[in-house]
Each structure stands twice: as C-alpha cells, then as structure tokens.
Amino acid sequence: EVVMAPKELAAYFGTPEKPECHMLYNVSTMVNLWGALASRDTRLLKAQLDALHALPDNCWFVNYLRCHDDIGWGLDEAVENRLGIDPQKHKEYLYHFYEGNFPGSWAKGELYNYDPATGDARSCGTTASLCGVEHALEKGDKTALDYAVKRDLLLHTAMAFLQGFPMLNCGDEIAQL
C-alpha cells in the first residue's frame, strides 16, 4: 500500500525489464471517488485518473471503495489550487459531510483522528453507510434509500470499469452497515 500522487507511483512498479511491485492499492482513486460524490464535482477525479492513465503499462492497481483503513483525505492540493478549490476547506467539508455533520449529508460515518490544531481528520464507515443506506433506514425513508442504493451502485460501477482489478471489501457485497 503506497499513499502518494500517481506520478510518484511508477517507481514502485519497476520497469518491464526489472519488475518490482505487480499491483498497488489504488488509494487515490478511492479518495477521489468519495470526494466527487460528496462535492458533486468530478474535476479532481478526472485529473487523478488522467495521471493514472499516463503511467507505464506495467502499473496495475487494485481498485476499491472501502477497506479496513480510514479514509485519509489526501487529495492533490496542487490540482485543487489550480481548480480554485481551497484544499483545507475542501478536506474539512468532506470529513464533516461523511460524518453526517453537514447540511444535506446523507452519510453516517465517523470522524477519526481529528486534530483541532491542524484541522485534519479522517473518515470511517462502510460503503453502504457513507452512501446513505444507514441514514435512510433509520428514518424509514424509501426515497432516500433508493438514492443511497443508486449512489452505492454508481461507485461500484465506476470502480469496476477502472483499469486494474476491482475488489469488494468490508461487506460491500451485502451493503453491510
């Protein structure tokens, strides 16, 4: 598992003549998929996918939506700045949104490792909970549940069509809360 910008990942794969790592977890795409879903803005995701597609052919990834780890909001701050997005405010929006502590949020995740001095935090939760299934079930809202399932399916469909190998994890196959 390597958590860094796509341009820095190629070295871990080696070369076709001297291969090293065969596959890496696709942490940055996971983070950018969740970011795009909450912000309803795909520009960061597109920039990150463009960077991945520019890597050599020997670079393969395991694509996933959730795993046993928290979501560290390690977005590409240079790209955010170029797009006119304040990196710190965006990160704070994302972790509050997925905590369910933002107006209009459907998510029911948990804040993890919050540091008031830096404003940094991470998010925890299953795919189903972050997509709104848990929140909709608690409210008995069938329309919200329908949207939550559609968000879950959207993310899984996107993941399945990314270059690399899709991985279901943490009860995704049964929408575990």
Predicted segments — roles?
Residues 1-177:
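Active-site and adjacent substrate-binding regions of carbohydrate-active enzymes
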